């Protein structure tokens, strides 16, 4: 198992390096300019979703000044179960796509959440427009995530004209 884990982690690091090279200029520019933040607001808050499931926010990422393709904001939500590793390992590995997200046109924010009762992970993203949100399921990083998900567990939805801050405030149980 240790060899398998190290092979997977090595593969992920290679993919990360390729991704940074692909999105390098905008990612590095955002990082160096101080536009990338990991705010604590909502971290450890429990969110009660529309289907009644409860997810806890364990990480947030925000990018200022990434408003290309502006329109009305949209939320992209994805939910799935990982097929390998325990919750702790997957929480740590879940940061790997961050450099790619930072470089994506229209990406503004991601909240990582988990339902520990069902072992489901959920990502809640803010995009600058519905068009930007609609591109995400066709991205390399989304494809990588779905390959790590247990078969048949990936679901997603796009919520046009929705501001993530207002949405989180409405569903947060603190």
Q: Where are the regions that the model predicts?
A:
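Generic marker of residues within folded, mature protein domains
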Residues: 68, 100, 113-114, 146-148
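Short, well-ordered beta-strand segments in beta-rich or mixed alpha/beta enzyme
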Residues: 20, 74-80, 109-140
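Exported/periplasmic cell-wall-interacting domains
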Residues: 134, 145-146
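Conserved short beta-strand edge segments in small beta-sheet-based binding/regulatory domains
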Residues: 146-160
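Short S/T/G/P-rich N-terminal loop/turn motif that feeds into the first structured element of a domain
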Residues: 4-108, 159-174
């Amino acid at each position: 198992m240790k060899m398998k884990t190290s092979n997977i982690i090595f593969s992920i690091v290679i993919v990360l390096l390729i991704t940074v090279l692909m999105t390098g200029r905008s990612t590095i520019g955002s990082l160096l300019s101080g536009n990338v933040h990991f705010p604590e607001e909502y971290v450890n808050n429990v969110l009660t979703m529309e289907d009644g499931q409860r997810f806890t926010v364990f990480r947030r990422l925000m990018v200022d000044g990434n408003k290309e393709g502006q329109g009305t904001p949209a939320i992209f939500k994805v939910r799935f179960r990982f097929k390998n590793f325990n919750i702790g390992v997957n929480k740590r590995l879940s940061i790997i796509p961050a450099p790619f997200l930072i470089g994506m046109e229209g990406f503004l924010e991601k909240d990582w959440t988990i339902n520990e009762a069902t072992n489901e992970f959920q990502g809640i993203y803010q995009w600058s427009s519905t068009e930007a949100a609609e591109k995400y399921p066709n991205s390399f990083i989304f494809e990588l995530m779905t390959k790590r998900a247990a078969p048949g567990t990936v679901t997603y939805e796009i919520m046009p004209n929705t501001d993530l801050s207002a949405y989180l405030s409405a569903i947060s149980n603190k």
